[in-house]
Regions:
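Glycine-/charge-enriched secondary-structure boundary and capping motifs
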Residues: 1-108
């Protein structure tokens, strides 16, 4: 395990506090957004980009590992009835985060 991020108190952009300057994070396979967050967006008028900065959007924990061990971690999570999936990857590049969701692509 190279890193773990609990996505509350910093939401989907929290990871940017913990990666080096040459890490470009791509999250392009996010979990479906629970209805609660859609209701918050609708009632508040907040745009989707800010929603991903403020709320975890139903995506609570990230574990950063090498691709070859990801399936085993997902299997262990599922044994405890915890949904898990690969949500993205890291590339070499300038420190940044790209979130690709059903509501658009957001750069941070």
């Amino acid at each position: 395990i190279h890193g773990m991020v609990h996505c509350t108190g910093g939401a989907q952009t929290k990871v940017l506090h913990f990666v080096s300057d040459n890490c470009k994070i791509i999250k392009d396979n996010m979990f479906p957004i629970p209805p609660l967050f859609k209701a918050i967006k609708e009632c508040s008028g907040t745009d989707w980009k800010e929603m991903y900065q403020v709320f975890n959007m139903g995506h609570r924990m990230e574990i950063y590992v090498r691709p070859e061990v990801a399936d085993e971690i997902i299997k262990i999570s599922n044994e405890f009835n915890i949904d898990a999936q690969i949500v993205g990857h890291i590339e070499n590049g300038n420190k940044s985060l790209t979130i690709k969701s059903e509501f658009g692509t957001f750069e941070y």
